[in-house]
Amino acid sequence: MTALSKKWLTGLITGALMAVSAGTLAAEQKTLHIYNWSDYIAPDTLANFTKETGIKVVYDVFDSNEVLEGKLMAGSTGYDLVVPSSQFLERQSQAGIFQPIDKSKLPNYKNLDPEMLKLVAQNDHDNKYGIPYMMVTTGIGYNVDKVKAALGKDAPVNSWDLILKSENLEKLKSCGVSFLDAPSEIYAAVLHYLGKDPNSSDPKDYTGAANDLLLKLRPSIRYFHSSQYINDLANGDICVSIGWSGDILQAANRAKEAKNGVNIAYTIPKEGAMVYFDMFAIPKDAKNTDEAYQFLNYLLRPDVVANISNHVYYANANKAATPLLSAEVRDNPGIYPPADVRAKLFTQSVLSPKIDRVVTRSWTKVKTGK
């Protein structure tokens, strides 16, 4: 064999080995598919997880429980971890959508607060199907200066009257009003405000006074959306919104960082409000369950979840993480409500299919104003 032939053969073998190695590495690349809410994780969480484990994360986002539920009910989502709210997880687990959580694969499960687990168990019995991620209250976000200008210094900013009393909302219309596009939560808030059971199983409660009030308010509501209000509050494009605690506090922080003179505040109304947890769960048809458990155990580390809470302004269920929270988060009553406020919070039970259909039809009428 000539020197040239040897050189050619060596090059051919080297190239083939490199191709095989590259193919092997590609085959060994582990992947995890996550479907989470928008604006709901720290900027470095996923990159740090990949750096530590070598697992590539494909991360998609949604902004309503209804969107997530539609995908889950259709089946074959392709996701290994999803994040329903606890009241939706209850219904979905009854439908056989999730795998039970194998706690033996989660050494860091011990970090969870027993009191928080007890709260979650109202929807996820025996804490069987979900891992609590962040605690959410549904309250009111408002532009301090614009609301004061519209309603005066005695504006009822600590009450549902601010946004559910038609004469107040009419005065706020010009500076912009938004509601969550979350029918079950809005109806629960309105029913509670009207002195009715927020978990009512009577269809007339949804088609009667609650619906009448929402239709009366409708002309003053600019839009229904479950994420747009964050930036709109921060930019001063709207002045009041029914929204989620951490989202509104993120808006306040964005305005502060932008130094745009917009002062946003969050209130849990004195009459009481809904509280629940968003939960990580593993769909029954998940293909990468080992990777899912690695990610869940990673999230249960105090340093990891504290970093997330410090960025998204939501309370977590990890007792060991509390000392690592920033004072801005830990001492904020809108994030970690004091005992007297917690006493007035209520959870939401799973809606029956019949009530769910009534709510969907009624909500469509409200959104269209008909």
Regions found by a protein language model. Give the residues of each.
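N-terminal signal peptide c-region/cleavage motif recognized by signal peptidases
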Residues: S21-A22
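Early extracytoplasmic/lumenal segment of secretory-pathway proteins
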Residues: A27-Q92
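Paired acidic/hydrophobic, glycine-rich loop segments that form the ligand-binding mouth/hinge
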Residues: Y79-P84, R222, C239-W244
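A ligand-binding cleft/hinge motif common to bilobed small-molecule-binding domains
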Residues: F88-R91, V240-N260
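Extracytoplasmic ligand-binding site segments that recognize negatively charged/polar headgroups
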Residues: L89, S93-S220, S227, D232-A234
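Periplasmic-binding protein-like
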Residues: T207-K216, R222, N260-A281
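Conserved C-terminal helix/tail region of periplasmic/extracytoplasmic solute-binding proteins
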Residues: N231, A339-K370
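Mature extracytoplasmic/periplasmic domains
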Residues: D278, P283-K344
